[in-house]
Amino acid sequence: MPTKTSTPSSQSPKLSHLRPQYIPNHIPDSSYVRILDTTLRDGEQSPGATMTAKEKLDIARQLVKLGVDIIQPGFPSASNSDFMAVKMIAQEVGNAVDDDGYVPVIAGFCRCVEKDISTAWEAVKYAKRPRLCTSIATSPIHMEHKLRKSKDQVIQIARDMVKFARSLGCNDIQFGAEDATRSDREFLYEILGVVIEAGATTVNIADTVGIVMPLELGKLIVDIKDNTPGIANVIISTHCHNDLGLATANTIEGARTGARQLEVTINGIGERAGNASLEEVVMALASKGDHALNGLYTRINTRHILETSKMVEEYSGMHLQPHKPLVGANAFVHASGIHQDGMLKHKGTYETISPEEIGHKRTTRIGIVLGKLSGSQALRKRLEELGYDLKEDEVDSVFWQFKAMAEKKKVVTDVDLKALVSYKAFHAESIWKLGDLQVTCGTIGLSTATVKLVNIDGSTHVACSIGIGAVDSTYKAINLIVKEPTKLLDYSLNSVTEGIGVNVTARVVICRENNHTSTYAFTEDANYPTFSGIAAEMDVVVSTVKAYLVALNKLLRWKESFRCA
């Protein structure tokens, strides 16, 4: 049974419109734009962005705070772990109804394959509002070289799979035309008409390779509206990639010309150059919807944008550029003397959007601070304010690490807390944990590392190794114990806090040896994903080792999921 909860999704003073009643194929208010967030599906396809089920659940709960209409939490048939994560989100997040009746649609992604569709339905059917999102390529290059099927065969598959999805009991079905912007127009109109007749309630127009200009996408939406049989009875959606840096502009133009569902990701993460950014699209609509976009609006609670962005950044390991619009470190920082003078006289001189609208706090650039005298309740409250829903034992675990840090640093900032939670979020699921570490390095001879790891079964294992530097020797020692061939794809260090007692965040990205970096494919061939790890410590080497273990444990859990599938 759905549970009644009170969420902030309807409490922002900016939300003057009521959310229209949810009907799969119709929006009672023609000015309302649905937001489908695919951070947990397409966003996770970014190399190194693989997330655990717990991390996905945390982000899904944060998306509810935002008031996202549809959450696409994954591709259930990709692996057993993906299936379980989507099912858990459907059960827990997909039944949390707020006081205004809002509950997100939980949408499982699947190819136009019966097994995929059945698996996706088994994962999402527990939600109050389940949806199936099935997709097939419609462009000549994809049909010829990837699918190796004729137009007639693709149309038949699309028709049959939408009907099959309907037969399972799902009444909310999205059909996606992959690479729609490079598809033959007449063929696109035809296949969309066929799936609408078969029972699709939303049709998704994908600019899969991010190749079109805004005017071209707008013209495509208008042409689809004018030439597709039955199009008035469904919702038109867009899914824009950012290969030319036009994803946000294309998405806004799609909405202006008739799309009433927009697929986006937090921070714009996704395949290759990423997807349209939720924060950019939503704030563009909020800022210009009344004046330039004929009154278009969403029900996104923008005050939760920043904390959601930071959570996704930490869990995915995808660091933001400082100049990233709205959520980058420099987005509301004014360094020029002329700009500072203008800001002192009137903030509107250089800010058209108030940073408070998206959750920034001007009181300090690094957030509210806690110290060594702070208790667990103060810590719990601050973690809740930052968007983290931790169990009692998880808070206790973070608390003792927080106290240890506070003894050394005197003050612990929001950034410190987020780094701690980011590590703890996965640490509980670890197969291997760091016991002890000793490293000898310098200008004479090779570096030597001695590592003790603790296995999930309680056994301890010790190994020594030499290498070129502390990191190399330590990783080699770990590999002697774990015996899992890996390749280090990326390694970076970042000082995430201010002051003398610097807390260093290490981020690593690994894959299995001889692996491709692509994390997703529509083919039957399994492409091993890449895995990122992030950890924060005051000791650079310890931080680096813990980050590597986080990534390594994710890889091992991923292998386990295939054995269980």
Curated annotation (Swiss-Prot):
Q: Whose protein is this, by species?
A: Glycine max (Soybean)
Per the UniProt entry, the Enzyme Commission number(s) are 2.3.3.13
Q: Does the keyword Protein biosynthesis apply?
A: no
Q: Write out the biased-composition intervals (Low complexity).
A: 1-15
The residues that the entry says bind a divalent metal cation are: D42, H239, H241, N275
Which terms in the Gene Ontology molecular function aspect does this entry carry? 2-isopropylmalate synthase activity; metal ion binding
- Which GO BP terms, alphabetically? L-leucine biosynthetic process; nodulation
Protein name per its UniProtKB record:
Probable 2-isopropylmalate synthase
Tissue distribution of the protein: Exclusively expressed in mature nodules.
Question: CDD domains under this entry?
Answer: DRE_TIM_IPMS
UniProt keywords (A-Z) are: Amino-acid biosynthesis, Branched-chain amino acid biosynthesis, Leucine biosynthesis, Metal-binding, Nitrogen fixation, Nodulation, Transferase
Q: Which gene encodes it?
A: GMN56
Q: Which reactions are catalysed by this chain?
A: 3-methyl-2-oxobutanoate + acetyl-CoA + H2O = (2S)-2-isopropylmalate + CoA + H(+)
Q: Where is the Pyruvate carboxyltransferase domain?
A: 33-306
Please give one Pfam family short name. LeuA_dimer
Quaternary data:
Homodimer.
Note down the stretches annotated as region Disordered: 1-21
Q: What class of enzyme is it?
A: transferase
Q: Which family does it belong to?
A: Belongs to the alpha-IPM synthase/homocitrate synthase family. LeuA type 1 subfamily.
